Amino acid sequence: MENLDFTALENSLQRLGKVVEIYKKNPQDTIVRDSLIQRFEFTYSITLKTLRKYFIERAFIVDDVNKLSFNEMVRTAMQLNLLKSDLAKWTEFREMRNLISHTYDENVALKVSGIVPDFYEEITYLLKELKGIK
């Protein structure tokens, strides 16, 4: 079985972690907040792609994986003990990602930036679990 390549997720997580630390020190800096949100967006996307690849690599049927809804994918990852948080928290991450991707609004940006540190911790946990199983 071929090993999964986690490089994209590792790199995006590292970049997100750097801006999370900067943002914690200066949350009023809109340039830093914008960077935080953008890095959240692409790390979120890479995370979902990585989970799908993981499921396929671990002998799930490709067509079945491609048909998984978001909720089913999160539940499957939870059953495999890959996630720290529950479906409700992952739904919040998804909602924040969807809100910010359609329009830019100051209040939405503040709301999204508020959950990014939790997201960072979650993806750090996920990556450790994925690499531990690799």
Model regions and ranges:
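Solvent-exposed interaction patches of small proteins and small membrane subunits
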Residues: 1-134
